Swiss-Prot record:
Name of the encoding gene: rplL
One of the GO BP terms on file: translation
Family that this chain belongs to: Belongs to the bacterial ribosomal protein bL12 family.
Intrachain disulfide bonds: none
UniProt feature coiled coil, ranges: none
Protein name, as recorded: Large ribosomal subunit protein bL12
Family annotation (SUPFAM superfamilies): ClpS-like, Ribosomal protein L7/12, oligomerisation (N-terminal) domain
Length: 123
């Protein structure tokens, strides 16, 4: 009986994502389908996207700082824009530099722009 109590306690401590993963594993193992009532499926479906890690980021140039020329050069190198377009983008901050970038790419762009003197954020 102690083993069953431990299993119940362990299941009670699972997060929503862990419980969903357990459900999928049991469905595969036993070859069954866990059909949930509509109300429960709606609640679980609404909560799941909030727990997912964001995979795409928009890199936003907030301010060019004191070294505007260096920031313009870096923006040109990162975006392939011409001098006038890059200058307009930098002077019009806050503006997006890159939209839909992966986490690694966004971090790389942010570090390059900050090294040039800009203030950058993700959205």
């Amino acid at each position: 009986m102690a083993d069953l109590a431990k299993i119940v306690e362990d299941l009670s401590n699972l997060t929503l994502l862990e419980a969903a993963e357990l459900s999928k594993l049991l469905e595969e193992k036993w070859g069954v389908s866990a059909a949930a009532p509509v109300a429960v499926a709606t609640v679980a479906g609404a909560a799941a996207p909030a727990a997912e890690e964001k995979t795409e980021f928009d890199v936003i140039l907030v301010d060019c700082g004191a070294q505007k020329i260096n920031v313009i050069k870096e923006v040109r190198a990162l975006t392939g824009l011409g001098l006038k377009e890059a200058k307009d983008l930098v002077e019009g901050a806050p503006k997006p530099i890159k939209e839909g970038a992966s986490k690694d790419e966004a971090e790389k762009i942010k570090s390059q722009l900050e090294a040039a003197g800009a203030k950058v954020e993700f959205k």
